[in-house]
């Protein structure tokens, strides 16, 4: 059958949970037996978020094919349990870049290039391509930003046109809004929702479903009022309450028949979603009997979205061992030799995540040394793996001044150096070693035991790599290179002997973790952290 298209927009304010709503609907439709793909359009002019500050954007989520994308793609992958691609995150910058390249090639035959039709046609092509290349029954597209933003207008015009292109029975518009509660008046207010829908309708888009974000139950008379003023069916006003766990949201939406409303509108004849496994997950999450305290020593801890996938992967591992994860966010710049014990002695495990730049580096190295010397379970990711190598070289081998060439180009001992193919690269954007690469694991190591396989595939995002000139010297001192590229040239995983669990990877294992299938390194890290309590 031809693909069906669902467009998710947002109004009133940002951060309403459009991404979670879209991902939850995707899960419900998948569990009805439909093949679902999902994408996000971001209105900013950056080509991708790869060079944006985490303070501006949160984490950069990396797909199998190496796309640097919005963190909402992490929600999509975790909820729907699918692997997405570069076609799943499109920015204004990418659209305009493509249009300008076509203009330079002469593809427009000398015509005047305009927002309509050239930019909108390019946007529509990205929607249709997502369905074509995946063979999806349903394509869900989230439009970033808020209705009324000037940056979003070309995207909204494009999705308006798609209804004419494919027929109204093949398109559904879902609009997310806010119903605020005014504490002083003791009232909930629907007026912002009405005005948001009025703005959307002025652009030619009539929503079929309205999902209202709310702190408390919405009275039926208010839902009826929204339906009347926004010209939708009463049952198509759906509530999205604040939930104790994100994974409750699909069940809340199913309880209000959202997926059935969508299927009826799109004329999809499919069985009811079987959410038994999902209900078991939510029940498990709600009744965890243990508690594990993990210290994340990072550079951007003030904005926890910068490490969103790391935190989620820890929680997934916790679900597996029946443990609630209590995260201590430790600001790396504040860690030093004098206070490291005070900051970290309550942690059952210590994690140093990825990052770029030299701020907070010495604090991270101090935390790594503390974990190694005090036998605290440790997991390092990307930069965390590189700094674990530097710490070992400095402390155990006595190589004073050892460092990464990224952080100190004049270091006498460049334990971490540029990948050979990166030596002459000048552009920062899109030039890292990105995406899925194989890793061969050594027999008899913690990493091999965790995965239970010799060759695994993980996602990468780095420019620097372990310097093989120091490999033999560090191996003799008890440093284990437990994972490498299949040709043995690139170091992928390191470990330390005589330690309950000290493992660090050059790749980013957090990106492939799922709530029902925790990533192996995270699972073993949390399991060892729990065991350390005893």
From Swiss-Prot:
Pathway(s) annotated for this protein in UniProt: Pyrimidine metabolism; CTP biosynthesis via de novo pathway; CTP from UDP: step 2/2
Chain sites annotated for binding ATP: 15-20, 72
Keywords: ATP-binding, Glutamine amidotransferase, Ligase, Magnesium, Metal-binding, Nucleotide-binding, Pyrimidine biosynthesis
Any one Gene Ontology BP term: 'de novo' CTP biosynthetic process
Positions of the Glutamine amidotransferase type-1 domain: 293-534
One cellular-component annotation, GO: cytosol
Active site, renumbered: 382 (nucleophile), 508, 510
PROSITE patterns: GATASE_TYPE_1 (PS51273)
Source superkingdom: Bacteria
Chain positions recorded as L-glutamine binding sites: 55, 355, 383-386, 406, 463
Binding-site positions, Mg(2+): 72, 142
Complex and partners: Homotetramer.
Purpose: Catalyzes the ATP-dependent amination of UTP to CTP with either L-glutamine or ammonia as the source of nitrogen. Regulates intracellular CTP levels through interactions with the four ribonucleotide triphosphates.
Further comment found in the protein's record: CTPSs have evolved a hybrid strategy for distinguishing between UTP and CTP. The overlapping regions of the product feedback inhibitory and substrate sites recognize a common feature in both compounds, the triphosphate moiety. To differentiate isosteric substrate and product pyrimidine rings, an additional pocket far from the expected kinase/ligase catalytic site, specifically recognizes the cytosine and ribose portions of the product inhibitor.
Protein name: CTP synthase
Organismal lineage: Bacteria, Bacillati, Bacillota, Bacilli, Bacillales
Gene: pyrG
